[in-house]
Swiss-Prot record:
Catalytic activity reported: GMP + ATP = GDP + ADP
Gene name per UniProt: gmk
GO molecular function ontology, one term from the record: ATP binding
SUPFAM superfamilies: P-loop containing nucleoside triphosphate hydrolases
Name the UniProt record assigns to this protein: Guanylate kinase
Enzyme's top EC category: transferase
Organism superkingdom: Bacteria
One cellular component term from this protein's GO annotations in UniProt: cytosol
Its biological purpose: Essential for recycling GMP and indirectly, cGMP.
Length: 207
């Protein structure tokens, strides 16, 4: 039987919900076989982040040049910064049979849905908006005005969770990690995915 094409896993949610923390927890697990697609951004690097590991950090001018060259699956401007997903790595890795894991903003996920309708979309939600605000304040990296801007944006994003296949509440990082891994495992066992492989196999037998 031919190698199964990889699954595109899209994790997104409001800023401050813990997407990066959950993603790191998933990739610390030695059983994880997903390939992480590193996003590109123009925002400033935070303490502890590494260029080329957490994000590819670019200037606004560099990012806009890549937009003109159509080098992104998706890109979005969020609170004054660009975020985007380089296209070629994702396509090549899926064709090799690997699952590709994207951690992106909600606006970006909407664009991916149009280009990759068969992708798996998971919305990471906070236990409450008050909890989200506390996390943003706890970062200590942004002004009160910017924090309020992110909370207001989060309200709109939570209303868009109906665009996703699954919602995982990040009340505890380890639990959120386990839920996401279980969702991916179940997705690979869906009848539609298994049936397509067997239909192809049966056609080859008839030749």
């Amino acid at each position: 039987m031919d190698k199964e094409k990889g699954l595109l896993i899209v994790l997104s949610g409001p800023s401050g919900v813990g997407k990066g923390t959950v993603r790191k927890k998933i990739f610390e697990d030695p059983t994880t076989s997903y390939k992480y697609s590193i996003s590109m951004t123009t925002r400033h690097m935070r303490e502890g982040e590494i260029d080329g590991v957490d994000y590819f950090f670019k200037t606004k001018e560099e990012f806009e040049a890549l937009i003109k060259d159509d080098q992104f699956i998706e890109y979005a401007q969020y609170v004054g910064n660009y975020y985007g997903t380089p296209v070629q790595y994702v396509k090549d890795t899926m064709e090799e049979g690997h699952d590709v894991f994207l951690e992106i903003e909600v606006e970006g996920a909407k664009q991916v849905r149009k280009k990759f309708p068969d992708a798996l979309f998971i919305f990471l939600a906070p236990p409450s908006l008050d909890d989200l605000k506390e996390r943003l304040v706890g970062r200590g990296t942004e002004s009160d005005e910017k924090i309020q801007s992110r909370v207001n944006e989060a309200r709109k994003e939570v209303e868009m969770m109906n665009l996703y296949d699954y919602v995982v509440v990040n009340d505890e990082v380890e639990l959120a990690k386990n839920r996401i891994q279980s969702i991916v495992e179940a997705e690979h066992l869906k009848r539609e995915r298994i049936e397509a492989k067997y239909r192809k196999m049966l056609l080859e037998v008839k030749k």
